[in-house]
Amino acid sequence: MQEEKQIDFDFNEILNQFRSGKRLTGKDGLLAPLIKQLTEAALEAEVESHIANDALNGRANRRNGFNSKTIKGTSDGSFELETPRNRNGTFEPQIVKKHQNTISDEIEEKILSMYGLGMNYVDISTHIEEIYQVSISTATISAITDKIIDKVKSWQSRPLDTIYPFVWLDAIHYKIKDGGKYVSKAVYTVLGVNMEGRKEILGLYLSESEGANFWLSVLTDLNNRGLQDILIASVDGLKGFPEAIKTIFPKTEVQLCIIHQIRNSLRYVASKDQKEFMKDLRLVYEASTKDLAEDELLKLEEKWGKKYPIVLQSWNNKWENLSVYFKYPKEIRKVIYTTNIIESVHRQFRKLTKTKGAFPNENSLLKLLFMGIKNAEKKWTMPVWNWSLTLSQLAIFFEGRLDSELKI
């Protein structure tokens, strides 16, 4: 058995050098040699234990020199690490694994933190060198952020609650390289409010197009992960969604977003008419009851129908799903009649991605959005406003469907 390495650390000498102004940490810091020796001593113990275990099991084995690699420390600087080998090539070090080039998670955590704030690889590399006096290539940073992909896959397939009282669906578009060219793809975000009143992203789904078949696959995925019931789903007029949701969740009420409908309507109204048109339209969607709203919609059609038939036709065709919120009290109305709650998530996504332009593949986008979700979740610690009253009202309107979840 090879003689165990001794730790050679002269405390008094280190103290004198520190007093003379030499740094303890960072590049060429005084502590780097100690970290190197401690790490190599631990590796020596590992390989000796491995060889001894082979001997106990009747396998001939012995040491076979060292491999050398540069270890990038955190505040303790960088150093050359000698990792022992064995003749059979079966030794797998655990203290510092074969392809590991840091001895702490601190750098990786800092890199992921900066990446989650939307910083690009070059800026991250610069900041890491400023903080730790360690040079990290953009390729290494990319490899570190790629570790998020496994977390994304696990998150995408995680079990869901059996019921979410409210669910919103909305899309945000990005340029992604596909087949050698950049194409526009939509990222559909599914946001729910659980029985505790807390927001939760249920899933992210990428697609070049929407439609009943696409939404059927999304809803089937949610169902397969444990979601059995949604009371009210709010969407922005996504094509084919109301039909698809009735297939998987036939009892769910579908509310089309009023704000999206207004925006789409104004695209077809002349600028000079928009102020007056909006004054009349507001009487429709701000009415206290559905009957009053329908009276105002008739007046709107009488006044503007000939000039803007496509706009009034859209309101009439979608009225069944646009008017769902009228049956509920104001506490529930405020929650469901727009998709503002999910648009705020997309605003956070845009902050992260605004400097990116386009993405080389889907994973590069998903891992960044996933970090954005993790950052948002840190703030989602409290229930949505007035949740206790809202939940009580839901229990009345959806009699029996919340009984299994209500602890009363």
Language model features with spans:
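Subset of Sec-pathway N-terminal targeting signals
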Residues: 1-18, 23, 30-66, 70-73
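Acidic/histidine-rich catalytic cores and adjacent linkers
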Residues: 2, 283-408
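Electropositive nucleic-acid engagement tracts
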Residues: 57-63, 67, 119-166
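Basic, short loop/linker segments at the boundary and entry of helix-turn-helix/winged-helix-like folds
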Residues: 61-117, 133-146, 212
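RNase H-like nuclease fold core
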Residues: 84-87, 95-99, 147-235, 239, ...
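Metal-dependent DNA phosphodiester-chemistry modules and their immediately adjacent helices/loops
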Residues: 92, 265-292, 299
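Conserved beta-strand -> loop -> alpha-helix junction used to position metal-binding or nucleic-acid-contacting
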Residues: 232-239, 244-280
